[in-house]
């Protein structure tokens, strides 16, 4: 019985085509994530400024996928707040403004590892 092996050039061409396809998909996903960030960040900044003006919080940082990752269509907005009277009010204010779920973490309840990473890599709001 003879076993037919695939043409090596055909296999290489197929692999190149698959690689190009996935590289294109990854590039599109990155572009979409950057567009989401660009659309959301100004609204989050404005909302946090309003929260500060209303005395709801003193300091805030963006972390998570909107700060250092690639936010997907189901990503929430993660915010660490300090000097916050009502984290739920801040989450509600920001969430209504940007139309996304918002997760607010109070500085006093955040693990030291999260605070350290946010201070080093987060976006000051």
Regions found by a protein language model. Give the residues of each.
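Catalytic core of pol beta-like nucleotidyltransferases
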Residues: 1-58, 68-73, 82-125
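Glycine-rich beta-strand-to-loop/alpha-helix junction loops that act as flexible
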Residues: 62-65
């Amino acid at each position: 019985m003879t076993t037919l092996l695939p043409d090596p050039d055909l296999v290489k061409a197929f692999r190149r085509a698959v690689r190009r396809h996935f590289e294109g998909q990854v590039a599109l996903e990155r572009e979409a994530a950057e567009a989401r960030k660009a659309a959301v960040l100004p609204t989050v900044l404005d909302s946090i400024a309003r929260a500060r003006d209303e005395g709801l919080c003193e300091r805030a940082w963006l972390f998570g996928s909107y700060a250092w990752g690639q936010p997907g269509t189901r990503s929430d907005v993660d915010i660490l707040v300090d000097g916050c009277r009502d984290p739920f009010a801040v989450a509600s204010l920001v969430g209504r403004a940007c139309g996304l779920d918002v997760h607010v973490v109070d500085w006093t309840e955040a693990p030291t590892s999260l605070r350290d990473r946010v201070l080093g890599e987060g976006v000051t709001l």
